[in-house]
């Protein structure tokens, strides 16, 4: 099915709010500290990602939309790191620097897919003059289709009513991800996007769908909102609008690893889609699909147009089944951040038989994820002769992708997958047959990266060549 994504390249969005830097330290935990009963993490990977309002801007820019970010920062390394990273993603930063305050920074230490501790470095910006923020909003109103106010209660949005009034006077939609229980400060917004706990903290505990709808409609009337979108985790999301039936959308997430930043993704996709000229219902549809993508990643993350298109077509955004090489690299990177061991093998897999299935199941048991690289049709002909393959590449990959033991399937055009393996660098490279490890394509690259290479036995009596010969013999009778 062809999916028509919104014309994101025509969308202009301004994001105003609490800007943060998210830092991540990853590493294995092998012992307990002699100083205190706490684990010792040997840090081997350090990452810095924009968080808060900056993550909203990243999500918008990653879709190909024009994102302009306004917020309060210090004059420090964290602010410079934010500006550098955001510029690489084509986010236009227009920060207001506050010399007396540090840039808000959150440091997370993770090991084996578990967050061990979070350290926050911040001082509230509540006393800072908001007028420079108002000036920046005024300057941008003629070139944007949506204004996002990203509220983390850190002080950047002390004058929300002024910001809403400026945008509404220019007929620009105002989308707000709320914080706290004082929804009065968001009066007149186009759309609020509270999660279920935030919604119930204001409206009260809801025992049924009807009660949620009833209380949501009261909030819309009480605070003069155009719409309310309640995000409900595994229950999806619910859109409420005056004089319209509620729109319930089930979740599209297939695996949930981390909900960090999921709300930023939702409001970012909503804003970009509305600014591109789509309806609110369409915006919610794409935002729901994007949320299913981002919770399958670790930490604050963004969604690309390819991932979004795959998600609305029903393909798992975390990457399962048939993939392009670039999609595979992204999926492997996410798996590594989750501490998963990646196993890789390759072959023609022309006529899938019991020996193949047994071999792949055994390979999968050696790690957490299994990649199968498949020779293209041209590569197979060079390797096996003009009569092969019997089954074309697309069919071979679909069948492999349907196996429970196989996570990712990718093709390669060369005679060997050496280039592909060098780009993926699995933790374990396996091959079936009577090879010596050093004879296996890609073994040198895997060893050089600290990985392992292993030879597994094929099941006796199973051979694609023998199956083909038997079919030919039977057909000649």
Swiss-Prot record:
Q: Per the UniProt entry, what species is this protein from, by scientific name?
A: Salmonella arizonae (strain ATCC BAA-731 / CDC346-86 / RSK2980)
**Region span, Cytidylyltransferase:** 344-477
> Which terms does the record give in the GO molecular function aspect?
ATP binding; heptose 7-phosphate kinase activity; heptose-1-phosphate adenylyltransferase activity; phosphotransferase activity, alcohol group as acceptor
The UniProt entry annotates the active site at 264
- Keywords, ordered alphabetically: ATP-binding, Carbohydrate metabolism, Kinase, Multifunctional enzyme, Nucleotide-binding, Nucleotidyltransferase, Transferase
Listed InterPro entries: Bifunc_HldE, Carboh/pur_kinase_PfkB_CS, Cyt_trans-like, PfkB_dom, RfaE_dom_I, RfaE_dom_II, Ribokinase-like, Rossmann-like_a/b/a_fold
Please give the biological process terms from Gene Ontology that the record holds: ADP-L-glycero-beta-D-manno-heptose biosynthetic process
**According to its UniProt record, which protein family does this protein belong to?**
In the N-terminal section; belongs to the carbohydrate kinase PfkB family. In the C-terminal section; belongs to the cytidylyltransferase family.
Subunit structure comment from the entry: Homodimer.
Position of the signal peptide:
none
Which positions does UniProt annotate for ATP binding?
Answer: 195-198
The name this protein goes by in its record = Bifunctional protein HldE
| Biological or metabolic pathway of the protein | Nucleotide-sugar biosynthesis; ADP-L-glycero-beta-D-manno-heptose biosynthesis; ADP-L-glycero-beta-D-manno-heptose from D-glycero-beta-D-manno-heptose 7-phosphate: step 1/4; Nucleotide-sugar biosynthesis; ADP-L-glycero-beta-D-manno-heptose biosynthesis; ADP-L-glycero-beta-D-manno-heptose from D-glycero-beta-D-manno-heptose 7-phosphate: step 3/4
The protein's matches in NCBIfam families, at most eight in alphabetical order, are given as: cyt_tran_rel, PRK11316.1, rfaE_dom_I, rfaE_dom_II
Question: What EC number(s) would the UniProt record show?
Answer: 2.7.1.167, 2.7.7.70
Q: Name one GO cellular component term.
A: cytosol
Catalytically driven reaction(s): D-glycero-beta-D-manno-heptose 7-phosphate + ATP = D-glycero-beta-D-manno-heptose 1,7-bisphosphate + ADP + H(+); D-glycero-beta-D-manno-heptose 1-phosphate + ATP + H(+) = ADP-D-glycero-beta-D-manno-heptose + diphosphate
